[in-house]
Amino acid sequence: MEFLLLLSLALFSDAMVMDEKVKSGVELETASAVCVYDAYYKDHTKYWCRGYFRDSCNIIAFTPNSTNRVALKDTGNQLIITISCLVKEDTGWYWCGIQRDLARDDMDFTQLIVTDNREDRANGFSSDPSGNRTRSCRASKAVQKAEGSRMSILIICILITSLGIIFIISHLSRGRRSQRNREVTGKSISRNPQASQGPSMVSITLARI
């Protein structure tokens, strides 16, 4: 009987519930979402994914892993998702999910809207009044741009070096061909006087006769 009760709980209950269906955030700040789940699933893998349809959403991270901007924290009955350094491209639909063995993964969604207007900040999002997060995000973006510039310069240097090597090889190849042509021409010239002496000697002999 207890097994049937647990089985029905696994099959028909809502194991994962999102705290809010719509969230608003501000660029360069931090967003956080909380998904509450039944403690029965505390040892199950949870995940955070993006997409309008649950069955085709793109998984961003599984517990206990995180990415450079998305951190997942599993407390045993809550999955806390934190997105740092928000950008407008983060606007979209997101799902928190829990993997289940005997049933379809249970998931719940929220819509995230990121703006550049600080007055549109809504509940569910944390901000740092001192502006440390904003400065950190801007510094991170500056580092990324600097790394991109260094990579572009490196690619240009490699291209210039490659073109220089190709030019040198081409120049040496043309020089060798020219030298061979001169050698062939010299040999031809040295042979022609011998060939031209024949007719002159014949003409002299005929004249004497």
From Swiss-Prot:
The chain crosses the membrane at residues 152-172. It is a single-pass type I membrane protein. InterPro entries: CD300_family_receptors, Ig-like_dom_sf, Ig-like_fold. It is found in: Membrane. Residues 1-15 form the signal peptide. The keyword ATP-binding does not apply. GO terms for cellular component: membrane. Keywords: Membrane, Signal, Transmembrane, Transmembrane helix. The keyword Transmembrane helix applies. Residues 187-201 have a biased composition (Polar residues). It comes from the Eukaryota. Residues 179-201 are annotated as: Disordered. PANTHER family: POLYMERIC-IMMUNOGLOBULIN RECEPTOR, TRANSMEMBRANE DOMAIN-CONTAINING PROTEIN TMIGD3. This is Transmembrane domain-containing protein TMIGD3. The lineage of its organism: Eukaryota, Metazoa, Chordata, Craniata, Vertebrata.
